[in-house]
């Protein structure tokens, strides 16, 4: 083989564009819908086309690309696709601000970001790219909606919702933060509007059970979060008969997981929207006003738990199902109409919220559990916390039920009340049905028609997709579709009469709940996904994304997979076999604070820093005026803190390979990564050293390739051992541990060993060549442009290269390093044969000149730790 020559200096900006062009010309990452042999589907969560990449994107997609390239080297066919989560509020709001159609804004952003992603060197099959805002995509989302509506898995109901008055849309509970909209920051109101819901609760048990099948592939933290969100509980429904049958004939039914505390109920609380509350308020203006006040508050559980407890007595009473005692009914702002029956039995002595409420409104507090085991223990406000929530104690102050523990009490109350029709055992879930209607324009049209005669009617399948007009420029005043008769005026498919098309659009979580399946056959026109392609590629082998998606996106995608399975679209029960949740990217923050407390944030690129000898920042000045700014510490890169680092600037200055290596080396993937300019420079220096090593080797012009294993020098044996140990470690670090940082550290060690090695004959040259080509191949998942360019000098095309095999014989050691101590202190080292005898080892240790000077007195003890050390005690 002829050895080539290369420029002595690494020029990323020269080599990277040509390598990327080569990949594109040869379509080396294109895969078929069905393939033979070993294959794998690696997917990073697709981006929202916000306008430009941020470092979180770079980290996410580099992780996916490292894994993809690794398995290609292992001989597998790998599908790694890319697309765009293109509907949603930000596009609409940007369109309002810039007076441009969201479609135009979105597709311009996609074009720019696609170019950025390609410059990162991702091994993506770009022929599978799609945007979720195209009719070709959402056609099949609408098709599924129609099927599910016909099966009763989607329904429409009037709902009290969180209404964001600025964004003019409904917010999920999770999108309300401290009573304000997560995006606009506006105070959230409550409104009653008709909405479409997915019956995700029909799948609650299966969604919970199937988490067990993900035990080996998903982070424990995510599984726990999903279990808690689904929130299965086994409890009892108990009915409290009405004491005011002339006003409210029905009793109040409550759900409780603590039926054992029934004898401690001192009042019953209902939600403001409960029918009993509304009945009581009919002739009570004060109560009606209070109900309205509650309605205007948040409906998010977290907010209700921490909000000030507010309440008002309805003047109505119910009877205790065991004693017949009359208990007052209160309206309480901490009771949710959407959970259980909208009513709770209040046991202030054994529930934190009830306790707080009872203290505020001077309601009785009756202890019925004694956690200490003393039957005569009286309730004490100071001791209350000790047995709040305890299931260990026995019942007290509970009449015939005294002395029973939790399960026995549960069974006894059920046995007493169930024959009277006042109780039954029930499993309940915290999970609520998924409201998907959004009162915005830039989303997938809901394929429903409202007819005065026929009610809600699905759009016929041959009329799908219902296409969203794309030439609309929203002005911010509600949904523009409501002002477009050309969109909403239609005929009823049932009676042929005039009808109105639904103008609400779908929650954008719907698009991201099935996109992974569409990638298997993005051009398929006969359904959501081609059956044989789904069978070939699904489920996704490795999914990568931020832990902030642990609950909603991942739960909805799991739900959709089951919906599609039940429609015969896909097989299997779960969409993602393995999940990697990467940590955030942090960067330094700098600001100035005005007298009114308002902070102005400065981008790190505009700051001149002074550091101490340990590299810590001791002063920072804004380059615009030379004046000092306050150092705010490291926080997640964000627009609000203006501390984002533009990936394009890093690529322009250092190249994509440097950005990739830094991102993978700076921290384990599941932990936060602290941005460091010095770290980027360090990654770049590493790649320059690799380049110089290869340039130096090629310069010598020796083409020896055959290794004579039987006649290796000790230095050559050491380098071969290091080479094959590195193969072993990098393989394990990438495949099993996802410890990309330690894989790169191992490559740095191999680089150092190769640099120190001095070849003295052809055998040495062949060993050095093996080390260098191995280094380049193992580095390829991290720095593919550099690796492809340099491997070509050795006659290897990276796109056809294979992961090096470990030579077990190279790992065996003929010699070992032994530490020699005198009285426990290091005095010398020996390089000896691995099968040296104990006597010979001691003799060589004592013969070391640097040891002999300390052997002045008689030797009391000779300690030999095999393969490690000799300690001579004198």
Curated annotation (Swiss-Prot):
Keywords: Aminoacyl-tRNA synthetase, ATP-binding, Cytoplasm, Ligase, Nucleotide-binding, Protein biosynthesis. It catalyses: tRNA(Leu) + L-leucine + ATP = L-leucyl-tRNA(Leu) + AMP + diphosphate. Pfam families: Anticodon_1 (PF08264), tRNA-synt_1 (PF00133), tRNA-synt_1_2 (PF13603), tRNA-synt_1g (PF09334). ATP binds at residue 639. A motif ('KMSKS' region) lies at residues 636-640. One of its GO terms (biological process) is leucyl-tRNA aminoacylation. InterPro entries: aa-tRNA-synth_I_CS (IPR001412), aa-tRNA-synth_Ia (IPR002300), Leu-tRNA-ligase (IPR002302), Leu_tRNA-synth_edit (IPR025709), M/V/L/I-tRNA-synth_anticd-bd (IPR013155), Methionyl/Leucyl_tRNA_Synth (IPR015413), Rossmann-like_a/b/a_fold (IPR014729), tRNAsynth_Ia_anticodon-bd (IPR009080). CDD domains: Anticodon_Ia_Leu_BEm, LeuRS_core. Gene3D superfamilies: 2.20.28.290, 3.10.20.590, HUPs, Isoleucyl-tRNA Synthetase, Domain 1, Valyl/Leucyl/Isoleucyl-tRNA synthetase, editing domain. One of its GO terms (molecular function) is ATP binding. Its main location: cytoplasm. GO terms for cellular component: cytosol. A motif ('HIGH' region) lies at residues 47-57. It is found in: Cytoplasm. It comes from the Bacteria. PROSITE patterns: AA_TRNA_LIGASE_I. Its EC number is 6.1.1.4. Belongs to the class-I aminoacyl-tRNA synthetase family. This is Leucine--tRNA ligase.
